[in-house]
A protein has these predicted regions:
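Short, low-complexity intrinsically disordered segments enriched in A/P/G/S/L with frequent Arg
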Residues: 2, 13-15
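Sec-dependent signal peptide recognition
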Residues: 21-28
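Short loop/turn and low-complexity linker motifs enriched in small/turn-promoting residues
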Residues: 38-202
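Low-complexity, intrinsically disordered short segments enriched for Gly/Pro and polybasic residues
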Residues: 10-12, 79
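N-terminal signal peptide c-region/cleavage motif recognized by signal peptidases
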Residues: 32-34
Length: 202
């Protein structure tokens, strides 16, 4: 009996190494794009406590030193700007040390409520409940205008809350943060600062 010739059909063309590299690169690009989109969404959600991005404020010191108590049914929020020093900065580095007139916008639940400039403070009434506070450095320098700090808290009727925003210069960078301080520290910061009056620029 004559042998039967068996022919096998090719399973498919083998991919070249360049095609495999191209596919891997495409997967990485898609992954990076997805991660970037998620990062942007998370950033937008975090900044939702602030106000409109393009809003600008002007701040003037006030001769009075007002320290009111909460009105009925409300909490009272003090926000104090605390400027630090940079002992390690070179004396001639004006860029690093020039934060004494830093203007910071203060937002609450997506609305700008005021601003501080220099060692100053202001206050505002707030309904009880959970709230989200935001500060943003208003500056013509892009790196500084991207400085944000956030805090969330639950306000109680009749309570007074003191938030300290700190701007500390550095030789090549800076510290920009926001924290809730105890009432003793808060009262000291308010007593050591100038009351500021701010309004949105048209």
């Amino acid at each position: 009996m004559a042998p039967t010739n068996l022919r096998t059909r090719p399973l498919g063309r083998r991919r070249s190494s360049s095609e495999e590299r191209h596919e891997s690169a495409l997967v990485l690009i898609l992954f990076a794009a997805s991660a970037f989109a998620q990062d942007q969404a998370a950033l937008a959600a975090a900044e939702a406590a602030c106000g409109p991005k393009d809003s600008k404020f002007e701040v003037k010191p006030d001769a009075g030193h007002l320290t009111p108590q909460p009105e009925p049914g409300k909490a009272l929020i003090y926000v104090v700007e605390d400027l630090g020093q940079c002992p390690d900065c070179e004396a001639g580095n004006a860029f690093a040390t020039n934060v004494h007139q830093a203007l910071t916008k203060v937002g609450m639940d997506g609305v700008w409520v005021g601003a501080n400039q220099g060692s100053s403070y202001f206050f505002f009434a707030l309904a009880p409940g959970e709230h989200h506070l935001c500060i943003n450095w208003q500056s013509r320098l892009e790196t500084r205008s991207r400085a944000f700090a956030m805090a969330n808290f639950t306000a109680e009727e009749g309570k007074v809350y003191y938030f300290r925003e700190r701007v500390f210069p550095g030789e090549h960078n800076y510290s920009f943060d926001l924290d809730l301080v105890n009432s003793d520290q808060g009262k000291f910061l308010v007593a050591s600062s100038i009351y500021s009056v701010s309004h949105s620029k048209k």
